[in-house]
């Protein structure tokens, strides 16, 4: 805490609007490297607290040449375009349901070009909005590629090669990450795309192979299937490894039952372009060693992400990274191995790769450096949602993690299979709509985790996340009156435990 107070005091002592340093060097109170969600939040908060702040941001084009504006992964090639395309896919299902509700709606084909144009225009409006927000808060924006010169100095190189030297008392690294390419696979880099490219395609990707078991892989595959495209997911081992595995199985089961082909236990070996511009992919079945091949219009790699640290010259500043992951090592205060250099968001070791956590961490860091608070970011019980066709929202521990931490005899799991009311009239399949509440067995049965698979999962989980963060018990949730008729009310009606062995299927209504 003494070090924190000292850093804050030095930061507070610098006059805003500072002067140029030696040799034309520009001096700031705070430099933020990276114009994504976390970096922008930190920069805007610090500026609002009276500091002279600069943001350095540069987007290296993807191997396929895709580039975008200010705002980072979430705005440009992540959460925002993904959710909009997910919504487009859900609308397709609603159109198919419409006749059952009395609407004589024609089943029109989907136009990728129209959707892509609308999504890209919205993203560009957000890029512009970020520029305006920085300008309004008097944050200086540099569209340059940054690298460290020493512990307090950064060199920014523009697209035209012009160099700018900038110094600051404090520096925040918020460069995020980029999709990983399997460069050991022949043709992967030349012919494959990633989520960095998908949302900026002007034409439909057509028949698509998605390689990977991450939430990015399943979300992309799900929305492509929902838009009417022939889509295959190739999974080497375990889908959604970081999530509750029962829920992960239900997610993939639902996808497989609703049009997405899933190849399990397979690994690609080669991608080659055919004369007609299609791609031939050769893969091996890891259980039988049998080789197979298929033809696709697009191959999308979703096998994980790597931190954007390679070009930062971190060694010049003495900033340490994890040699395995490449991520920057930080403590609870987001401080790196250098006391006045910090890292937040996806680039930091051990942090959730989630936009809201990066934003909150950035704001809290700016407030601590300005002496406004000593509060640290709490990374426990962070809610999240996987936007697959049937959405999966969760907060807290998975069943596996709870058992590993507390022991099976000390964990009680309440669960239910339920049918959303809106699924009844069109007779939609609801066999994977499922809720699971993981609790300590001893009264009052503290809730350790909540998992929800069904429509609007993110909206459902957000509300319960507050209760779980505040230490809600199973008994308290069972005494919470639900809103009827909703899917969310089923959470407050979980009476069947796994231990009981009783059928958890919800029957009846209004009683």
From Swiss-Prot:
Residues 1-21 form a transit peptide. It catalyses: [thioredoxin]-dithiol + NADP(+) = [thioredoxin]-disulfide + NADPH + H(+). It is found in: Mitochondrion. Its main location: mitochondrion. The keyword NADP applies. Its EC number is 1.8.1.9. Disulfide bonds join 74-79. GO terms for biological process: cell redox homeostasis; response to oxygen radical. InterPro entries: FAD/NAD-bd_sf, FAD/NAD-binding_dom, FAD/NAD-linked_Rdtase_dimer_sf, GSHR/TRXR-like, Pyr_nuc-diS_OxRdtase, Pyr_nucl-diS_OxRdtase_dimer, Pyr_OxRdtase_I_AS, Thioredoxin/glutathione_Rdtase. Inhibited by 1-chloro-2,4-dinitrobenzene and by zinc, calcium, magnesium and Fe(2+) ions. The active site is at residue 484. It is an enzyme of class 1 (oxidoreductase). The keyword Oxidoreductase applies. Pfam families: Pyr_redox_2, Pyr_redox_dim. One of its GO terms (molecular function) is flavin adenine dinucleotide binding. One of its GO terms (cellular component) is mitochondrion. Optimum pH is 7.5. There is a cross-link at residues 509-510 (Cysteinyl-selenocysteine (Cys-Sec)). Involved in the control of reactive oxygen species levels and the regulation of mitochondrial redox homeostasis. Maintains thioredoxin in a reduced state. May play a role in redox-regulated cell signaling. NCBIfam families: TGR. Belongs to the class-I pyridine nucleotide-disulfide oxidoreductase family. Homodimer. This is Thioredoxin reductase 2, mitochondrial. It comes from Bos taurus.
């Amino acid at each position: 805490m003494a070090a924190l107070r000292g850093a804050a005091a030095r930061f507070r002592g610098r006059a805003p609007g500072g002067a140029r340093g030696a040799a034309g060097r520009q001096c700031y109170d705070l430099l933020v490297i990276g114009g994504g969600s976390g970096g922008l939040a930190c920069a805007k908060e610090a500026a609002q607290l009276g500091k002279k702040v600069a943001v350095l941001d540069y987007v290296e084009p993807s191997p396929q040449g895709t580039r975008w504006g200010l705002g980072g992964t979430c705005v440009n090639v992540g959460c925002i375009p993904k959710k909009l395309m997910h919504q487009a896919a859900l609308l397709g299902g609603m159109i198919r349901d419409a006749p059952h509700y009395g609407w004589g709606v024609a089943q029109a084909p989907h136009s990728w070009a129209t959707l892509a144009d609308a999504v890209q225009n919205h993203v560009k409006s957000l890029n512009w909005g970020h520029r305006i927000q920085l300008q309004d808060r008097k944050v200086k924006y540099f569209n340059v590629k940054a690298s460290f010169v020493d512990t307090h100095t950064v060199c920014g190189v523009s697209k035209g090669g012009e160099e700018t030297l900038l110094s600051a008392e404090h520096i925040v690294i918020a460069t995020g990450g980029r999709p990983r390419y399997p460069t050991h696979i022949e043709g992967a880099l030349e012919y494959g795309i990633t989520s960095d490219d998908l949302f900026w395609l002007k034409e439909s990707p057509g028949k698509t192979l998605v390689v990977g078991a991450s939430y990015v892989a399943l979300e992309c595959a799900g929305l492509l299937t929902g838009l009417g495209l022939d889509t295959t997911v190739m999974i080497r081992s375990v889908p959604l490894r970081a999530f509750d595995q029962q829920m992960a199985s239900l997610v993939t089961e639902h996808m497989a039952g609703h049009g997405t082909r899933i190849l399990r236990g397979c690994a690609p070996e080669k991608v080659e372009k055919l004369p007609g511009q299609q791609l031939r992919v050769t893969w091996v079945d890891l259980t039988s060693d049998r080789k197979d091949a298929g033809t696709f219009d697009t191959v999308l790699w979703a096998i994980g992400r790597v931190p954007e640290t390679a070009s930062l010259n971190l060694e010049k500043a003495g900033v340490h990274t994890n040699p395995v992951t490449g991520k920057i090592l930080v403590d609870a205060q987001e401080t790196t191995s250098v006391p006045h250099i910090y890292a937040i968001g996806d680039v930091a070791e051990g942090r959730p790769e989630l936009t809201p956590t990066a934003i909150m961490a950035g704001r809290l860091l700016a407030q601590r450096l300005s002496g406004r608070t000593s509060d640290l970011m709490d990374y426990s019980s962070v809610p999240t949602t996987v936007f697959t066709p049937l959405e999966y929202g969760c907060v807290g521990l998975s069943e596996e993690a709870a058992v590993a931490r507390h022991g099976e005899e000390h964990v009680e799991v309440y669960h239910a299979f339920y049918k959303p009311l809106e699924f009844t009239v069109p007779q939609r399949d609801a066999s994977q709509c499922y809720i699971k509440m993981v609790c300590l067995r001893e009264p009052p049965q503290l809730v350790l985790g909540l998992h929800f698979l069904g429509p609007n999962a993110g909206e459902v989980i957000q509300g319960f996340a507050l209760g779980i963060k505040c230490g809600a018990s199973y008994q308290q949730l069972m005494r919470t009156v639900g809103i009827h008729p909703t899917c969310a009310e089923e959470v407050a009606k979980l009476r069947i435990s796994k231990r009981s062995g009783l059928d958890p299927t919800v029957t009846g209504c209004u009683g």
